Amino acid sequence: MDGAMENLYRKIAAIGRRFRAERVVLFGSRARGDNRSRSDIDIAVFGVSPDDLPAFREQLDELPTLLEFDLVFVTEQTNPKLVANIERDGVILMDKMQEKYEKLVQAVHRLDEAIVDYDQMGLDSIRDG
């Protein structure tokens, strides 16, 4: 994948975050790697409010690319075969739960470092009040 496409995918993920999507997934030929240079960009979006769909699509259309977007907003009514295809071939661009997990891991790491620092300070530096 070239740098321009990676940058575009980061911008798509940022739009997903802005609209509080649960997940944004690249699927289709670009996810599988069998795309042509002019292939469209298939994007599946999970967990966006139906009221936000037009604005989400508008922001995608403003991205700096000549490529077309094929956008699927996944709901409970989405064809199960399509969802299975997205799950099988998809490349996750943004996942809210994964990002929360990564932040938790970072916080635990910082806490571990703080505990080590505290232990190295010794009890003499602890004051009451």
Task: Give the predicted meaning of each segment.
Residues M1-R23, A31-S37, V48-G129:
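Catalytic core of pol beta-like nucleotidyltransferases
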Residues A44-F46:
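Short hydrophobic/aromatic beta-strand micro-patches
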Residues S39-I41:
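Periplasmic OmpA-like peptidoglycan-binding domain that tethers envelope proteins to the cell wall
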